[in-house]
Amino acid sequence: METCYCIEPQWPADELLMKYQYISDFFIALAYFSIPLELIYFVKKSAVFPYRWVLVQFGAFIVLCGATHLINLWTFTMHSRTVAVVMTTAKVLTAVVSCATALMLVHIIPDLLSVKTRELFLKNKAAELDREMGLIRTQEETGRHVRMLTHEIRSTLDRHTILKTTLVELGRTLALEECALWMPTRTGLELQLSYTLHQQNPVGYTVPINLPVISQVFSSNRAVKISPNSPVASLRPRAGRYVAGEVVAVRVPLLHLSNFQINDWPELSTKRYALMVLMLPSDSARQWRVHELELVEVVADQVAVALSHAAILEESMRARDPLMEQNVALDLARREAETANHARNDFLAVMNHEMRTPMHAIIALSSLLQETELTPEQRLMVETILKSSNLLATLINDVLDLSRLEDGSLQLDIGTFNLHAVFKEVLNLIKPVTLVKKLSLTLHLGLDLPVFAVGDEKRLMQAILNVVGNAVKFSKEGSISISAIVAKAETFREIRVPDFHPVPSDSHFYLRVQVKDTGSGISPQDIPKLFTKFAQTTVGPRNSCGSGLGLAICKRFVNLMEGHIWLESEGLGKGCTATFIVKLGIAEQSNESKLPFTSKIHENSIHTSFPGLKVLVMDDNGVSRSVTKGLLVHLGCEVTTAGSIEEFLRVVSQEHKVVFMDICTPGVDGYELAIRIREKFAKCHERPFMVVLTGNSDKVTKESCLRAGMDGLILKPVSIDKMRSVLSELIERRVLFETS
């Protein structure tokens, strides 16, 4: 009997397969049920997922698939009809849901693919933005380095410090192995190694400036990569075991240095450049980047500007010492000029007073002699003395006026005056001379010329008298015509003078005065000289007597009145035309302003004598005191004199109607004396009229007299006619005062 040692299996093969299917269906169902749970969890966490219904369908499909696998566990054995119905229902639902999901995916998948495309696009854009941000950061870093380097370079104006600082800062910022600067020699044919980063005193290597590599760099305004073996790049000895780093070179313009004589710099007749060479570390894979090259270019430009400023500073420092010496000399000359000017003014002030005092005696006594019985020969001599004295007084006035015009102390005395009366008075003053010389004298006043105007009456009359007087002086025969009109705007176009710019206005007008004569004429080349002080013509009859001050003073008066004066003549023997234009204000009211300070000379005075008028004269100069007393006695006045302040205060009384005093008195000046008189006579009608008799003709004296309460001012010298006119005016004012 055969024995079988076979081991019976624990489970039959069919049963084993069945168990595997059970287990597989169970895990499949478990997986199908877990997937929807995971989808639901992640969908709830996502706030922007756009396909929620698709996930619901897909989840239902998976759940139904899992359910079919779960139900299938009961179909491997005998099962009831109910299980079959459930299984069938589950499969039908699974089929429906799966088909619906499949149809939905047909529409969803393209969108999902486009989402992926947009994702890739966004990734590319993000990468591009990252690159741009990196570029911006690089540019910001470059800008920061440029600002830092510029600050370091501009922190000094010493050119050696500028160049050394540039190399040090570039080497630190760019981590350079070496940096050098080649400067052109004085001949301009070579470049010399002048500054390096690591060598304190580099050996003066030179290379020809016409090397191709140098020409290449100089012809470009950008940084240029050059060979490490180039002569300008061989800055340090290299062993053969390593590879040299990359080298760039850039030109440095030497701006405007040809204008400055810098001793050890090249003579730059044309545009020249220095050469800056920069070397990266050896045995490294580092290369020059774009922003580093831009940094080098910007720094080269900044170095050029800084060197230009340094050159300017060196030249200014070199020129400073001579300028300081000149300033010291100019300051000394200014002080000397001021001292001389003060001395001149003091001299003129003293001479003015001291010269007018004897002139006062001469003119006063001569005028007194004229009114006595004289033989024709004696009268002629007295008239000659009087005319010469008046001429000398005029010269004194001219010199003083010119002095004050030159130092700017003379100012116009503006007031309202009768313009027509000024011309008539000039005519009356000039007519006697023209009658003697048998000259025809005519005056034409424009119909539109205002009767009253605002300006300086005295200076205007002086200017007219100067011009007319010159015409009379240099005319032996013929005629002289004076015309005065309001200058129109079209006449200004004829005058082409840079300093004369008339501006029409409703508040002022321009007076045009023209004087024509048929006299000796002027050579054209002499016309410009006539407005220079002490200048006279050198040819022709105009080289006659005169101080040469009249037209010079007249021109300055016209300039003060914002006008212009000029002469015209066709030549010698053809006469002359003098024209001037001055600016005058338009008077608001047609009445002549009364200036209490100015004594006006009335030729036809109401009173020819003043019998019984008590007058007190105070003057420390005995001659002047006696002369003034003589004039007043001749006019019938009862005169009391005083030679000092004490005597004056002792004798002055209410009986005295007029007081003549000299303000230049030792001890107490006339201004303080006037104040004492006002204090002594409290009531105005008891106080005598106070008239200053002085040789000081400046405006300050007049203003001081006005502040002190003076009633009038008379300039020495004084003639008998002038004294008669002054007393007539004072008597009129006294009568008017008492009746008021």
Curated annotation (Swiss-Prot):
Family: Belongs to the ethylene receptor family.
Cofactor: Cu cation
One Gene Ontology term, aspect cellular component: endoplasmic reticulum membrane
E.C. numbers: 2.7.13.3
Principal cellular location given in the protein's record: endoplasmic reticulum
Record PTM text: Activation probably requires a transfer of a phosphate group between a His in the transmitter domain and an Asp of the receiver domain.
Pfam families: ETR1_N, GAF, HATPase_c, HisKA, Response_reg
Catalysis performed (reactions): ATP + protein L-histidine = ADP + protein N-phospho-L-histidine
Subcellular location: Endoplasmic reticulum membrane
Quaternary structure and partners: Homodimer; disulfide-linked.
UniProt topology in membrane: Multi-pass membrane protein
Gene: ETR1
4-aspartylphosphate PTM positions: D662
Any one GO molecular function term: ethylene receptor activity
Record-listed Phosphohistidine modification sites: H353
Regions crossing the membrane: 23-43, 53-73, 92-112
Task of the protein: May act early in the ethylene signal transduction pathway, possibly as an ethylene receptor, or as a regulator of the pathway.
Entry keyword set: ATP-binding, Copper, Disulfide bond, Endoplasmic reticulum, Ethylene signaling pathway, Kinase, Membrane, Metal-binding, Nucleotide-binding, Phosphoprotein, Receptor, Transferase, Transmembrane, Transmembrane helix, Two-component regulatory system
Domain Histidine kinase: 350-588
Biological source species: Cucumis sativus
Protein name: Ethylene receptor 1
Gene Ontology biological process: negative regulation of ethylene-activated signaling pathway
Highest taxon in the source lineage: Eukaryota
